[in-house]
Amino acid sequence: MYLKFITLFVLFFLFCSCKKENISESPSKEAIPLEIKYGKVFFDYDQIDYYSTNLEEGKIEELDKNQNKSKVDKYKYTVTIDETPETITDLAFLKYMEKIGFVKKKIDSSKFPEINKIFIEKTASDGYAAACVPVFRDILIFKKLGKVIGIAKICFGCHQYRIIGTDADTENFGTNNDYEKLKYILNSI
């Protein structure tokens, strides 16, 4: 009984001694918007091929298990989960895109100005570090005069990306609601 009384007293004391803090700001303080400065566009292009797949979460583990069964299975894994392509000249995977479950669409040039606002250098960053393995279900192939000049692999679930073929600073890609804007554009195609 005595032990119960002491335990209750300690809990009551701890509860009462917790400091409550008023978090509300005074009305005179206004939020200062983060100024974003834009730099160089990532790619100088005249065509974008958009590849997408509806790979289900449950099938991802299967990709890893099956990657050594055939060339198609290997590409399915390396394109969707891994680092393929490693360079802008590593284009063999493009021959397999439809075989590994991607659907190809052409992005109308009327969307290019909106896309340029996303694939551009930014000085401000409101990004975060993702703690998941990216599954690249959306891939953009940027071309100039029929030649591939840039590739962007996007994981909308993790907000991760892999962009190759540009010397622009891609570090702040994804800030300023880039993922939401890009997803909206791609869903409208």
Language model segments and positions:
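Function-determining sites in protein domains
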Residues: 19-189
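Bacterial Sec-dependent N-terminal signal peptides
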Residues: 1-29
